[in-house]
C-alpha cells in the first residue's frame, strides 16, 4: 500500500503517463466529456468530493504550466488555480476537452467548475 499521496490507482497511472504540454482536466459532475477521452470518475454523490478537495490532492503530484477556464467560472475556482490562466467561452472549453489525456470528474455541483490544465516539467 502507498504511504502517502494519491491512492486512486487509475489517477496515479494517468498522471504518470503525462508528458510536457499534455492537457488534462478537473470537472464538475455535469460537464459533458467526449466519449474517447478517459474519465477518472471520483464522484460519489452531489458535492463529494468537491473541486477544491480534488485540486488540493493533485497539486503536490503534478507540474502545471497553464490552465484554461470558461468565462462563467466562479472567482473561487479561478483563485484555486496557481498558474497562468486563459479564459475562453464554455463552448471552447468543451471543445478543448477532446484533446485532454483524461478528465477527472468530481462531485462538484457549482456551474462552470471546470479547468483544463497544461502539464509542465519538473526540471
Swiss-Prot record:
Any GO MF annotation of the entry: intramolecular lyase activity
Q: Which gene encodes it?
A: rbsD
Q: What is its EC number?
A: 5.4.99.62
Q: Tell me, how does this one assemble?
A: Homodecamer.
Top-level taxon of the source organism? Bacteria
Q: Which UniProt keywords apply?
A: Carbohydrate metabolism, Cytoplasm, Isomerase
Pathway per its UniProt entry is:
Carbohydrate metabolism; D-ribose degradation; D-ribose 5-phosphate from beta-D-ribopyranose: step 1/2
* Active site per UniProt: 20
Question: SUPFAM superfamilies in the record, alphabetically?
Answer: RbsD-like
Q: PANTHER family in the record, alphabetically?
A: D-RIBOSE PYRANASE (PTHR37831:SF1)
- Name the record gives this protein: D-ribose pyranase
Q: One Pfam family this chain carries?
A: RbsD_FucU
Q: Where does this protein reside within or beyond the cell?
A: Cytoplasm
Its UniProt entry gives the catalysed reaction(s) as: beta-D-ribopyranose = beta-D-ribofuranose
Question: What's its top-level EC category?
Answer: isomerase
Role this protein plays: Catalyzes the interconversion of beta-pyran and beta-furan forms of D-ribose.
The GO biological-process annotations, alphabetized, read as: D-ribose catabolic process
